[in-house]
């Protein structure tokens, strides 16, 4: 199978790439390396099997459509995104440029390249504030994002559905909880487990702000990669929450 993975040099994307090449897929990674690293691609099975091509490119650049289409993928996994909620509030235009325009570049490439399916990475941020009585959260819960980031991730799922209706492009959206695991950036705002692990290894105390009673759903990156593979291999679409519960 021929697969495109945008954001494939990131910690989630590179884990997915390892799984894809492990089963024999030919993979094109599109990543601008602004937060990912090509070292993530040489650290796993990608370097062993030699079936990965890296295209260093901003996903929102107009060339993305041509690059995706010319690869003639069977499937596209779209993980490239601006993921910092604070940055989305400070610069919502750039957030939309990457998360909305970037998605449209990829969708057009998938359509023109006759891809069978796109798997889109969304987020629990599409639901906004959730009362604990609603947990574990079901996919039919009200979607009321409270940040530009959450808005773009909800818009992305809607665009994917529209491309299915207009062009017959298969699509599945995965709304991820807080992902943790190897290759995670210990400096990111969502990387609390990586941050704690780094501090513990350095024999330093871990700081918890607020009441200490906050709850978050964390999911291991390997389980997320498995969810992507299952979403790609199955015909049904729609939106699925991916978490531990």
Residue ranges and their predicted role:
Residues 1-179, 232:
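N-terminal Rossmann-like NAD(P)+-binding domain of SDR-like oxidoreductases, especially those catalyzing
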Residues 6, 179-183, 208-218, 240-245:
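Glycine-rich Rossmann NAD(P)(H)-binding loop
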Residues 65, 184-185:
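A short local structural element in Rossmann-fold oxidoreductases
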Residues 80, 110, 188, 200-201:
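Hydrophobic aliphatic residues
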Residues 90, 98-101, 140, 147, ...:
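Residue-level signal for the nucleotide or nucleotide-sugar donor/cofactor binding architecture
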Residues 133-135, 186-194:
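A glycine/serine/threonine-rich, flexible loop-to-helix segment
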Residues 194-206, 216-241:
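Alpha-helical substrate-binding/gating segment
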């Amino acid at each position: 199978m021929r697969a495109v993975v945008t954001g494939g040099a990131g910690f989630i994307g590179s884990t997915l790439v390892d799984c894809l090449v492990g089963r024999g897929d030919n993979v094109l990674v599109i990543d601008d390396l602004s937060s990912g690293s090509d070292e993530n691609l040489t650290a796993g099975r990608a370097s062993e099997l030699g079936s990965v091509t890296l295209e260093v490119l901003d996903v929102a650049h107009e060339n993305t459509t041509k690059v995706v289409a010319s690869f003639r993928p069977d499937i596209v996994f779209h993980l490239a995104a601006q993921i910092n909620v604070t940055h989305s509030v400070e610069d919502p235009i750039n957030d939309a440029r990457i998360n909305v325009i970037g998605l449209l570049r990829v969708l057009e490439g998938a359509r023109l390249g006759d891809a069978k399916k796109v798997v889109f990475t969304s987020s629990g941020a599409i639901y906004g504030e959730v009362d604990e009585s609603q947990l574990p959260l079901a996919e039919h819960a009200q979607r009321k994002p409270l940040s530009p980031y959450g808005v773009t991730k909800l818009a992305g799922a809607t665009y994917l559905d529209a491309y299915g209706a207009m062009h017959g492009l298969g699509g599945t959206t995965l709304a991820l909880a807080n992902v943790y695991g190897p290759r995670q950036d210990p400096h990111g705002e969502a990387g609390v487990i990586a941050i704690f692990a780094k501090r513990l290894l350095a024999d330093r105390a871990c700081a918890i702000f607020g009441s200490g009673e906050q709850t978050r759903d964390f999911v291991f990156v390997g389980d997320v990669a498995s969810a992507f593979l299952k979403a790609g291999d199955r015909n049904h679409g729609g939106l699925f929450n991916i978490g531990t519960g």
